[in-house]
């Protein structure tokens, strides 16, 4: 079952990306290194509620 998640920047807290994940394969919160337009660099983005 895939669910929609929001990814927030760990440095500025801005929610920049919307993605989906499979809860069966990834039960924990996911982290991706993505581009943050506010910081103008690639930062770590974590799943938020």
From Swiss-Prot:
SUPFAM superfamilies xrefs: Zn-binding ribosomal proteins (SSF57829)
Cross-referenced InterPro entries: Ribosomal_bL33 (IPR001705), Ribosomal_bL33_CS (IPR018264), Ribosomal_bL33_sf (IPR038584), Ribosomal_zn-bd (IPR011332)
Regions of compositional bias (Basic and acidic residues) in chain numbering: 25-49
GO biological process, one term: translation
GO cellular component: cytoplasm; ribonucleoprotein complex; ribosome
Molecular function terms from GO: structural constituent of ribosome
Sequence similarity: Belongs to the bacterial ribosomal protein bL33 family.
Protein name: Large ribosomal subunit protein bL33C
Gene: rpmG3
């Amino acid at each position: 079952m895939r669910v929609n998640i929001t990814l927030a920047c760990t440095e500025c807290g801005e929610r920049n990306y919307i993605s989906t994940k499979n809860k069966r394969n990834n039960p924990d919160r996911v982290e991706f290194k993505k581009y943050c337009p506010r910081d103008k660099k690639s930062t770590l983005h974590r799943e938020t509620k």
